[in-house]
């Protein structure tokens, strides 16, 4: 796929969990009520997960798509060193997905992910109260265009 997108490893999942961006950490813990280490290690056991690396080889983030098309991504501060490269690699990953519908919710406070989702072509649907703390989240989706007429 790309020299910056790799099949997930336990090591990469632990690196991401240990170095989450503050907004991502807050989204996982406050928004979903989950422990980042447990969550990412469980996700790493799934074949559909990948991790992103920087040009220097550092772990920049981790992403996956659930069976129902629910897409997710969590990042480290490494993305700040190469924001354009990371955004392009994230787009490459999203564009490679064959699901007709990709969707999820994002913490309204997570400005980095809101900006990235817009760049990736996702549409924002509505604001909802979500999770154990009923925080404001935004539903988003992207419908794959058919190549057939």
Where do the model's predicted regions map?
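A short helix-loop-beta-strand connector motif used in the catalytic cores of GNAT acetyltransferases and
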Residues: 39-52, 60-61, 98, 135
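A structural microfeature
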Residues: 61, 126-129
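Conserved acyl-CoA
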Residues: 88-102, 111, 120
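A short, internal acetyl-CoA/4′-phosphopantetheine-binding micro-motif in the GNAT/acyltransferase core
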Residues: 72-88
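C-terminal "cap" of GNAT-fold acetyltransferases
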Residues: 130-149
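Conserved beta-strand in the GNAT
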Residues: 55-70
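Short amphipathic alpha-helix that is part of the acyltransferase structural core
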Residues: 1-34
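Conserved beta-strand-loop-alpha-helix junction that forms the acyl-donor binding cleft
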Residues: 103-118, 129-132
């Amino acid at each position: 796929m790309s020299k910056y997108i790799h099949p997930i490893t336990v090591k990469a999942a632990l690196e991401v969990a240990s170095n989450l961006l503050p907004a991502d950490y807050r989204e996982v813990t406050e928004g979903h009520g989950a422990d980042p280490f447990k969550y990412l290690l469980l996700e790493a056991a799934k074949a559909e997960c990948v991790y992103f690396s920087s040009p220097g080889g550092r772990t920049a983030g981790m992403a996956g798509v659930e069976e129902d098309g629910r897409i997710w991504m969590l990042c480290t501060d490494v993305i700040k060193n190469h924001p354009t490269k990371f955004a392009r690699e994230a787009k490459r990953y999203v564009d490679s997905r064959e699901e007709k519908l990709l969707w999820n919710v994002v913490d309204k406070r997570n400005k980095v992910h809101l900006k990235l989702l817009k760049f990736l072509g996702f549409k924002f649907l509505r604001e909802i109260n979500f999770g154990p703390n009923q925080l404001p989240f935004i539903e988003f989706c992207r419908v794959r265009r058919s190549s057939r007429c």
